[in-house]
Structures are given as C-alpha cells and as structure tokens.
C-alpha cells in the first residue's frame, strides 16, 4: 500500500487527573481525536465507522484482490452476530471444548506481597485465561473464526503466530472441524518456541518458517497476507490479534470480549461491584481489548496496557509502540507504529515472542489518543522477575507476555489506596517460556 503517511503534528494530549484510587478522571480531549470518521462523536469505544476506522485509526490498506474477501467476511460476521444457531453452537464449544468460563482468582499471596507496612494495599485478582484449552486466550477467537470459515465454505486455513499460542489454538480448532491448517512463524520464534512448533505439527498443521526481516511476528504476518492474496478464493486467514485491515480488529475484539463480560459478572458475584483497575499486556492487543471493551464506558474503571520495553525504551531494542511510535500503516491498518524518519519499520525487540511486534491494534491507538486508556512499558528483566515472583508466590507460571502485566504491579500497587481491586489478565501459561527463562533466571 505504499509508504506509511507521516505522523501528524500538533496533536494535543489529554490532561489527566487521579482520584484516591488512582483512577482516571475526565479532562479535555482533542476534538479531532474523539471524532469518528463519519463526523459523529464517539462515546468511547464502539463499532468502527463504515470505513473501518476508530477515529483516524484502522481502515483497509490492502491490495484490490483482498477487498472482496474482506467485504464478504464483514457481511458474514454481521449476519452471524444475529444468528441464534451460530451463537448457540459457539457458546457450546466455548463451554465444553475450551472450558469457559475462566476463573477470576483472588491472588492472596500476591496481594499480601504488595501490602504496605501498615497492612493496607490493593486487592489483586487474576483472570485465568491461562486455564483455557491450549493455555491462552487465543482459542476464543480461533474457535469463532473457524466456525465462520466453515459457514463461508473455506476449507483451507492460514494463520500467523509469534509465541506460538495462536498457532496452537488455530491448529487445534482446525483438527476439531476437519480443516487444512498452515501456520506462518518467524524462524527466530520457531527456535525460542520449539515446544509450540512441535505441538502445532502434532496437531497436523504445516508450519512454514519465515526467514525474511528479523524472522519474527511482523514477518510471519506479512507472509500470511501474501498467501491470502494468492489463495483468497479457497482460504480463510485467522488473524490472531486486533490488528490488520477491517473487519479484523472489530471482529477479533468481539470474539474476545467474553473475557470482560465474564469479569464483570464474576466481580459482581464476588464483591458486588466492578474492578477498579484492569491491567493487561499489549502486543497487537487482543487479550487487553477482550478485557477492556466491556468497561470502556465505565469511566470509573481504569484501563492500563503494558507493552514490551525490551532493553529499555531509550534503546533500539524494545517494542513499545504506543510509547515511542508514530502513526503509520502496517499490515493493512493505520495505527501507531515503530518507524524511522523515512517511514520504514523499525525492528522491535522483546524477550516475549508474543509482544515482539512493531505495530498495535487501531482501537488501542484510539483509546490512547482520547485518553481513555493509559499505556506503559516493562523491560525484559522486569518481566523475568515477575515470571519468577508469581511462580513462587502463587504456584502459577505465567507466560512471559502476561509477566509484563504482572511486573507493572511493582509500580502500580504503591500508588493505590487500600482495598482497590485490580484485575490482571493472565493471558497465557508459561510452560512454553520455561526454556527461555531458564537462560536468564537463577532458580
């Protein structure tokens, strides 16, 4: 689609304030930032406009050969959204095959760890997406898109994967529904996630190594899109995050919003209210959007996303797109992007393969610009420390992606009033990362 457009100048930042619970309070936002593409004011996060945009972000920057497939996909998605039979089938599979709903777990020892000397501190809960079949949140979307592909008559499925969890989830559902499965994965990611590569192949998927670029998630996504362009008539692309061209950001979010809906219901059951703070890691941003979306209109609920700072955001080894990026186009969508002055993509770095991506979902960019969500970053070492800390305190080995969110508790908890309820999305389990962590941690 050509080089990314230059980053806009003169963007006003939203003023912020905090109440005693550390929650965001309303402040002025740039009118341009909160206007949808059709000129209507956006009351937070809703559906994108007719062009697939959230404010200035999103859209369809794709070859003409893909436009029909995207239009067909959007039409099918909207039709199935009101199809009771489809919803019943999906709900049944999520319950009996995936194992939903996932628990909202009170992390008692982690809560105790962050208490102050006077015994006060926040209460920490984990949304246990790591307990889903295949070990992460990714299967929520994979199951739904596989069902959608069947309705479209597509028997060949392709997907990209970084950490391997989306690849495993896609391979799993393809076996469940008898579909052909091809997974694109960066050669570097295949080395650090060898266990997941074996799992995908055990499940009958063809895993194609991508050696171009840095041989990571960005390059795997590019190859998957090339495949789709070539085989669009027979193939459905199960994109694994809230990125890519419209309708994928909206559609993947809708398939993951079960995370936030369950969290709201479980919070009401457990303490008769809502969470005060929601925390999730952000690469492309699907697990965070799945948790956040339900609460975007609840202005008293604070939304915090954590990106990968790698070796530090002031080095050239990080993946902190929302912290350091500029607006550009990647993989069919306009969003914040790590790029140089010439609009060329800067290669990201993270110890976590799932966060090692130079872009981010357009809705996250929109939430950042309107000031509804806040984004920070966590270094490799901080994530490794949290990986070990949570394993030792709670007997839960989190994914390195999740560990970025858990690491932020070190910074967040001292700022919160007593009794503030924090929900961290435990987006995946860390079995896949034990080999990587063992190179850095002394246990």
From Swiss-Prot:
GO MF assignments:
tryptophan synthase activity
Q: At what positions is N6-(pyridoxal phosphate)lysine found?
A: 138
This protein's cofactor list reads:
pyridoxal 5'-phosphate
**The protein's enzyme class:** lyase
Which key words are in the record?
Amino-acid biosynthesis, Aromatic amino acid biosynthesis, Chloroplast, Lyase, Plastid, Pyridoxal phosphate, Transit peptide, Tryptophan biosynthesis
On whether Magnesium is a keyword of this UniProt record, the answer is no
Purpose of the protein: The beta subunit is responsible for the synthesis of L-tryptophan from indole and L-serine.
Instruction: Report the protein name in the record.
Output: Tryptophan synthase beta chain 2, chloroplastic
Native organism: Zea mays (Maize)
State which gene encodes it: TSB2
